[in-house]
Amino acid sequence: MKNLLAVIGIAIVFTYVIGSGLWVNTGDNWYRTLNAPSWQPPPAIFGIIWPYNFIILGIAAVTIAQRAATTTTLIYLTFFALSVACALTWAFQFYRPHNLSFAALALVGTVLLTIPMTVIAFRTSIGLGVALLPYQIWVAIAANLSYTYSRLN
């Protein structure tokens, strides 16, 4: 059962990676015409943080599946899947129909859903919880960034 749950966790990460790749497009003309927040991180930061986030999410899913009780793992994976659904809703709403306000709300959902994930990670392993904190912080920054985009545009 633990191996199956680990595979499900990895599948959620792959869904996140593939979905993000399908919808996020910062190179198109529409995105370039947006008024960007003055505090937006430079593109290089995105190139560093996202690979880290995807890797640590995979490590967290496998570690929790292997070390935590089955019920705890199922709770973690449920919050993880829902948070990814919200994050992908953001990507779609922001870059396809350009619904910036709804996109920002979707990221707020991601932020809220990652809180119990981080708590479970800390309860499983202090080191794992610490390693997952950058993701929690990043989605909070992203939600604020998305909200600011919706206000400016």
Name what the model sees in each region.
Residues P42-I55, H98-L112:
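Membrane-interface loop-to-helix entry segments
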Residues F80-L88, A104-M117, Y135-V139:
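Hydrophobic alpha-helical segments of small multi-pass membrane proteins
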Residues L34-S38, L100-G109, G129-L132:
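Non-cytosolic membrane-interface motifs at loop->transmembrane helix junctions
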Residues A69-T71, F92-S101, F122-I126, Y149-N153:
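Membrane-interface helix caps and helix-loop-helix hairpins in membrane proteins
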Residues M1-L22:
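N-terminal signal-anchor transmembrane alpha helix
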Residues T26-S38, A65-T70:
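Membrane-interface helix termini and inter-helical loops of multi-pass transporters
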Residues I55, I59-A91:
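Helix-adjacent hinge/juxtasegments
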Residues R123-N153:
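Terminal transmembrane helical module of multi-pass membrane proteins
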